[in-house]
Amino acid sequence: PVAGEENQYIAYVAYPLDLFEEGSVTNMFTSIVGNVFGFKALRALRLEDLRIPTAYVKTFQGPPHGIQVERDKLNKYGRPLLGCTIKPKLGLSAKNYGRAVYECLRGGLDFTKDDENVNSQPFMRWRDRFLFCAEALYKAQAETGEIKGHYLNATAGTCEEMMKRAIFARELGVPIVMHDYLTGGFTANTSLAHYCRDNGLLLHIHRAMHAVIDRQKNHGIHFRVLAKALRMSGGDHIHSGTVVGKLEGERDI
């Protein structure tokens, strides 16, 4: 029973390992939470945690690189890396967006980033944004003598289009791309993570849509589970909101 709650119980469920496809977060989630949440016998259900056997974890590639490789790429050690999201995130032309990126990087930031829904809209197509951001990046690098980065959002409507954007980012020579892993899907995210590892790109992850799944305390999936799934699927770091800002969170964490 759950302390202080009526008709709530904690259940521990174990599954044979052979029920799961190796290296597939998609299959793991389909098997564990794909159907049970819809059972009419349940009023609510929440997946609080997963304990994943080491033998299964080892079938996943995991993060493309990690913090040490990121610091080596940037040649920045012994301090936090400081960045910001470009605002207003929607409505700027690609040229004005690139200007904002330049001013932030020239002013001292290590990184700037696209926001989660900056994809390829009529006012700013993705290729134009990538080109102007790369120009801003290299201009700021030349003037400061530091290695800079901009998280180019490769999220797209199809996996093929997503990969096209990631490939173009690599051709421009930028150090990092980003992806919305929940709205984009685990299959797409894992494919992108594999490409990033093979081609030396860092991968930043945005958690857009997470609160639909994890915010209610008596139903859904705890974010620790979504974070474990992401670590298996692949991502070098994840957006978590500002320390004190507009997003819901526990202050003591």
Swiss-Prot record:
InterPro entries tied to this protein: RuBisCO (IPR033966), RuBisCo_large_chain_AS (IPR020878), RuBisCO_lsu_C (IPR000685), RuBisCO_lsu_C_sf (IPR036376), RuBisCO_lsu_fd_N (IPR017443), RuBisCO_lsu_N_sf (IPR036422)
Enzyme Commission numbers on file: 4.1.1.39
Keyword Zinc: no
Reaction equation(s) it catalyzes: 2 (2R)-3-phosphoglycerate + 2 H(+) = D-ribulose 1,5-bisphosphate + CO2 + H2O; D-ribulose 1,5-bisphosphate + O2 = 2-phosphoglycolate + (2R)-3-phosphoglycerate + 2 H(+)
GO BP terms in the entry: photorespiration; reductive pentose-phosphate cycle
N6-carboxylysine: modified positions: 113
Chief location of this protein within or outside the cell: plastid
Record: active site: 87 (proton acceptor), 206 (proton acceptor)
Domain of life: Eukaryota
Binding positions (substrate): 35, 85, 89, 207, 239
Enzyme class: lyase
Site residues (Transition state stabilizer), renumbered to this chain: 246
GO molecular function: magnesium ion binding; monooxygenase activity; ribulose-bisphosphate carboxylase activity
Family assignment from sequence similarity: Belongs to the RuBisCO large chain family. Type I subfamily.
Its job: RuBisCO catalyzes two reactions: the carboxylation of D-ribulose 1,5-bisphosphate, the primary event in carbon dioxide fixation, as well as the oxidative fragmentation of the pentose substrate in the photorespiration process. Both reactions occur simultaneously and in competition at the same active site.
PANTHER family on file: RIBULOSE BISPHOSPHATE CARBOXYLASE, RIBULOSE BISPHOSPHATE CARBOXYLASE LARGE CHAIN
Subunit architecture: Heterohexadecamer of 8 large chains and 8 small chains; disulfide-linked. The disulfide link is formed within the large subunit homodimers.
UniProt-recorded name of the protein: Ribulose bisphosphate carboxylase large chain
Source species of the chain: Magnolia latahensis (Apocynophyllum latahense)
Upper taxonomic lineage: Eukaryota, Viridiplantae, Streptophyta, Embryophyta, Tracheophyta
Gene name of this polypeptide: rbcL
